[in-house]
């Protein structure tokens, strides 16, 4: 089975969030089921610079404002996976963030940049590469939302049955919204600009295009698949998603054990397993405290936070709960960037409690590994969370997750309540209500359990025994593909 994945990020070449981890890990995981995956990406500088021994597949005349368009085929470095790269310098050759300028303002022509991505995917689905034609095209998030639309448009124009499409929502809150006036530049049928298409409250939505035109929709956890069908989390698209509930699947993301594995992680102070976790984590914790300038206290409960600093991630709650942690002798290490006001608040807290709180603004993949290995608790207090990968990394490293009961967090973490401790299923700390009071109670439970060393070790062992690799999830996605291929024959 041949599957083309269409996305804007791919770890380790280009990453701004968890999307890159998923698009990197899923193709090799699917290979175990006989799926021949290839990936299509925009020619951002990171991709152009990373790929070697590329071959020119085709040159395409000017389109979507790009004067020169070359499609290259190469191997993703250090893998057997093929990658198509759209080299269109006038659209993609820009430094820094792939979506926004140095002032963090989204590029005004993003609609053209990602229209080209979708249009090229449709052409590949029709045989642009004479040696490889996909049976399924799987697009990821709003950047690739037009992929199913262009494939459907081609089917309508030619009268020929098109390949089947799958669209994955990694985060419904980011919808790729543009003024209605840009539609004429997208080269799509006029009938697509309607409620039954791209139109979304007087704008054009790339996310809605993917949700409406794809044959099947997946999102990244069973709970999130339910949540996005109701008003509170549907971001205005709950009606469409509820109508398509029979085509909507919630499939948990997984962890790539080649990258996130305390037994062989070269980025952390020392390697450890579930049998050597006590001494291993103690060394990682000390190294982290030294690196971040915290007091070197082995018995201080260390809370790690690796996140984008946005309101979605529940950082406003955490700010209110800082005193609860420091007053009990706990420590905090935070890595992240985003909202400038939040950055300033956390930096001020680190200055005030310099031996208890350390903050590093920015994103550093290596430091993320060190924080997760060296912390006792990893905090993910998100207001909403489609899946979340950080808590899965925490389980893998024996760093107990403290999470809000929402989305994939609810699907993956079991609270250390008395009954769950008694039956040996607890893996972390879960708070139900999105409030400072509820978060504070979870923090207090973490301190209480930490003081009961035997129980803490049992929960940590259970956490590390959780199966969070891609094996099960890849099989579920393969079954979706398989049913679509059968349906199309």
UniProtKB/Swiss-Prot annotation:
The keyword Glycosyltransferase applies. It comes from the Bacteria. One of its GO terms (biological process) is glycogen biosynthetic process. Coiled coil: none annotated. The keyword Glycosyltransferase applies. GO terms for cellular component: cytosol. CDD domains: GT5_Glycogen_synthase_DULL1-like. Its EC number is 2.4.1.21. Gene3D superfamilies: Glycogen Phosphorylase B. Keywords: Glycogen biosynthesis, Glycosyltransferase, Transferase. Belongs to the glycosyltransferase 1 family. Bacterial/plant glycogen synthase subfamily. NCBIfam families: glgA, PRK00654.1-2. Synthesizes alpha-1,4-glucan chains using ADP-glucose. This is Glycogen synthase. It comes from Francisella tularensis subsp. holarctica (strain LVS).
């Amino acid at each position: 089975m041949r599957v083309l994945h269409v996305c804007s990020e791919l770890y380790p070449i280009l990453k701004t969030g968890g999307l890159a981890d998923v698009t990197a890990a899923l193709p090799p995981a699917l290979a175990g089921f006989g799926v021949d995956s290839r990936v299509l990406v925009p020619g951002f500088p990171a991709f152009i610079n990373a790929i070697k021994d590329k071959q020119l597949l085709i040159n395409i005349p000017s389109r979507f404002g790009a004067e020169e368009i070359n499609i290259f085929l190469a191997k993703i470095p250090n893998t057997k996976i093929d990658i198509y790269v759209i080299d269109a310098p006038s659209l993609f050759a820009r430094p820094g963030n792939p979506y926004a300028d140095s002032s963090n303002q989204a590029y005004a022509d993003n609609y053209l940049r990602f229209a080209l991505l979708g249009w090229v995917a449709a052409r590949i689905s029709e045989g642009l590469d004479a040696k490889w034609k996909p049976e399924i095209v799987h697009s990821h998030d709003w950047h690739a939302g037009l992929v199913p639309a262009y494939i459907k448009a081609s089917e309508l124009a030619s009268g020929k049955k098109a390949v089947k499409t799958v669209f994955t929502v990694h985060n419904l809150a980011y919808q790729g919204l543009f003024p209605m006036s840009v539609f004429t530049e997208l080269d799509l049928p006029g009938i697509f600009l309607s409620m039954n298409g791209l139109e979304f409250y007087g704008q054009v939505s790339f996310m809605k295009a993917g949700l409406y035109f794809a044959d099947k929709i997946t999102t990244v956890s069973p709970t999130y698949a339910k949540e996005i069908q109701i008003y509170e989390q549907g971001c205005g698209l709950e009606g469409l998603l509820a109508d398509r509930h029979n085509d909507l699947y919630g499939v948990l993301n997984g962890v790539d054990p080649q990258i996130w594995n305390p037994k062989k992680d070269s980025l952390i102070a020392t390697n450890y397993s579930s049998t050597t976790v006590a001494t291993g984590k103690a060394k990682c914790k000390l190294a982290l405290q030294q690196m971040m300038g915290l007091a070197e206290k082995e018995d201080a409960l260390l809370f790690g936070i690796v996140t984008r600093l946005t309101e979605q991630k529940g950082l406003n709650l955490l700010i209110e709960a800082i005193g609860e942690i420091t007053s009990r002798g706990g420590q905090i290490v935070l890595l992240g960037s985003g909202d400038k006001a939040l950055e300033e608040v956390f930096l001020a807290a680190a200055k005030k409690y310099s031996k208890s709180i350390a903050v590093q603004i920015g994103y550093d993949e290596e430091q993320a590994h060190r924080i997760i290995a060296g912390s006792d608790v990893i905090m993910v207090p998100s207001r909403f969370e489609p899946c979340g990968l950080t808590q899965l990394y925490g389980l893998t490293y024996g760093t107990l997750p403290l999470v809000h009961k929402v989305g994939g967090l609810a699907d993956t973490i079991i609270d250390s309540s008395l009954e769950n401790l008694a039956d040996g299923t607890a893996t972390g700390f879960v708070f139900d209500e999105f409030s400072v009071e509820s978060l504070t109670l979870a923090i207090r439970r973490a301190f209480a359990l930490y003081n009961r060393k035997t129980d803490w070790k049992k929960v940590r062992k259970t956490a590390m025994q959780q199966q969070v690799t891609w094996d099960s999830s890849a099989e579920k996605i393969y079954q979706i593909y398989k049913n679509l291929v059968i349906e199309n024959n």
